[in-house]
């Protein structure tokens, strides 16, 4: 669910669009992914843009979707942070 790489940390997330608020819901143990609630609808990339904005604000870093542009399951790179910082911000 979290993997430290040279560029930063890769998060494996599952996005739940149309939520009441943007938030980290918890961990989906079965899928091995972090559950992220996003207010935006999954239409024309709105949920992806909102996910990037939410995670960028949470970590204070640049965020990029590496895999899963059209799926709810995504691999996201948070640049310039380490694993401990990500765990602390996610409260894991």
UniProtKB/Swiss-Prot annotation:
InterPro entries: DUF167 (IPR003746), YggU-like_sf (IPR036591). One of its GO terms (cellular component) is cytoplasm. It comes from the Archaea. Belongs to the UPF0235 family. This is UPF0235 protein PYRAB05010. It comes from Pyrococcus abyssi (strain GE5 / Orsay).
């Amino acid at each position: 669910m979290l993997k430290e790489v040279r560029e930063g940390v890769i998060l494996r997330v599952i996005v739940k669009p149309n939520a009441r608020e943007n938030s980290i819901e918890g961990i989906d143990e079965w899928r091995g992914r972090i559950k992220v609630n996003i207010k935006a609808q999954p239409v024309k990339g709105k949920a992806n843009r909102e996910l990037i904005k939410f995670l960028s604000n949470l970590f204070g870093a640049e965020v990029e979707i590496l895999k899963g542009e059209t799926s709810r399951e995504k691999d996201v790179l948070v640049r310039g942070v380490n694993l401990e910082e990500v765990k602390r911000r996610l409260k894991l």
